[in-house]
């Protein structure tokens, strides 16, 4: 084989591998393309699962078995993406989506902290959505939580309200989300195997976050609100709390590498090894300052920044030292609100000219 042909073949193989990694979690596209409920399909129409793009063979089989789950998986993915964008709105990488089935584009081909967070928050979103759908009677294979009564619950409090079924949500999310990674058979010791192990670890960390933060909720019963009796159940934490928890894990994520036993090990052995609740990554993050088609970085040109902040949202860091443009904009807000009898609030509209700063 000539050197030119060898180079072309290598380039082609590298391109294919990158495309497979970019689309590695393309089930995320369920968040961007609304999933129709199974009952909306008429006789003779194509089955739901054949119309969904981005599913791996294993995920497609699960879709066929649990068609009523798919709309909630899409909702969970959407919840995860929105939370990702909230947590990173003041960072150079702000969890932007692109208009294709990869959802996040080439930025996910790097085994970075950002990829770790994205896998974790998406997996958490599925647990959250499926657990709640069980409680609301939306799914045929689950119902209210069957979690045993907590030992520290006062004896005179009743345990029996319809709780979020976190156990089922965790199990189903593990089966569905991890299916793509587990059905692959990468060569031992390869970069692809290391990345797959990284993805599985971060998927699990996201699921555990939802499970760990779920807590007991109670409702009072009694004459005139005397609360002489309480009924309690298991309830999911607000997903914002889950996002904040996983963001903390992002900040303390462990740098890993593949060892000779084909397991991930921590690069710095002086630190405690990560637990199943921790995020892990393989590659250093790009600086995300400039647009880069290869890494998927969209850059920070045109992003708003805070002139007075010294944090990541400050103009110096957000704009990567390139400077910023200042312009004035008119903001309209409700003001001078008064309660009117009965029963509404009447407000005036106030305009204010404010300075805004945008990265060059």
Curated annotation (Swiss-Prot):
* One GO location term (cellular component): extracellular space
| Protein name stated in the entry | Protein Wnt-5b
Statement: the UniProt record of this protein carries the keyword Secreted = yes
Check the record and name the Pfam families matching this protein.
wnt
Q: Which organism is it from?
A: Xenopus laevis
**Modification comment:** Palmitoleoylation is required for efficient binding to frizzled receptors. Depalmitoleoylation leads to Wnt signaling pathway inhibition.
Transmembrane portions of the chain:
none
Query: In the UniProt record, which residues carry a glycan?
Result: 94, 100, 292, 306
Q: Name one GO molecular function term.
A: cytokine activity
The record's similarity note reads: Belongs to the Wnt family.
Give its localization: Secreted, Extracellular space, Extracellular matrix
Question: Which positions are lipidated as O-palmitoleoyl serine?
Answer: 224
What's any GO biological process attached to this entry?
A: positive regulation of non-canonical Wnt signaling pathway
Keywords of this protein's UniProt record, alphabetized?
Developmental protein, Disulfide bond, Extracellular matrix, Glycoprotein, Lipoprotein, Secreted, Signal, Wnt signaling pathway
Q: Which PROSITE patterns match?
A: WNT1
């Amino acid at each position: 084989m000539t050197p030119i042909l060898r180079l072309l073949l290598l380039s082609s193989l590298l391109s294919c591998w990158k495309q497979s990694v970019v689309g590695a979690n393309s089930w995320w596209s369920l968040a961007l393309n609304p999933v129709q409920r199974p009952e909306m399909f008429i006789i003779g129409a194509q089955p739901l699962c054949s119309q969904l793009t981005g599913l791996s063979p294993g995920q497609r089989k699960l879709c066929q078995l649990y068609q009523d789950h798919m709309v909630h998986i899409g909702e969970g993915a959407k919840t995860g993406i929105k939370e990702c964008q909230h947590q990173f709105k003041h960072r150079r990488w702000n969890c932007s989506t692109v208009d294709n089935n990869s959802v996040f584009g080439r930025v996910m081909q790097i085994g970075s902290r950002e990829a770790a967070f994205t896998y974790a928050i998406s997996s958490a979103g599925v647990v959250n959505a499926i657990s709640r759908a069980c409680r609301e009677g939306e799914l045929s294979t689950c119902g209210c939580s069957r979690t045993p009564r907590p030992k520290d619950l006062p004896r005179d409090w009743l345990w029996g309200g319809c709780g979020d079924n976190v156990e089922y949500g965790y199990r189903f999310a593990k089966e569905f989300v991890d299916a793509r990674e587990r059905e692959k058979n990468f060569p031992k010791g390869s970069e692809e195997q290391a990345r797959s192990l990284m993805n599985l670890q971060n998927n699990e960390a996201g699921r555990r976050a939802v499970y760990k933060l779920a807590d007991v909720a109670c409702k009072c019963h009694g004459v005139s609100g005397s609360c002489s009796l309480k009924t309690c159940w298991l309830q999911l934490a607000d997903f914002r709390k889950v996002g904040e928890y996983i963001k903390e894990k992002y900040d303390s994520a462990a740098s890993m590498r593949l060892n000779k036993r084909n397991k991930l090990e921590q690069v710095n052995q002086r630190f405690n090894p990560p637990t199943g609740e921790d995020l892990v990554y393989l590659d250093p993050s790009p600086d995300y300052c400039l647009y880069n088609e290869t890494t998927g970085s969209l850059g920070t040109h045109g992003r708003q920044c805070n002139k007075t902040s010294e944090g990541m949202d400050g103009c110096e860091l957000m704009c990567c030292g390139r400077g910023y443009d200042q312009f004035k904009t008119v903001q309209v807000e409700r003001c001078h609100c008064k309660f009117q009898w009965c029963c509404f609030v009447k407000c005036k509209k106030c305009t204010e000219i404010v300075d805004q700063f945008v990265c060059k």
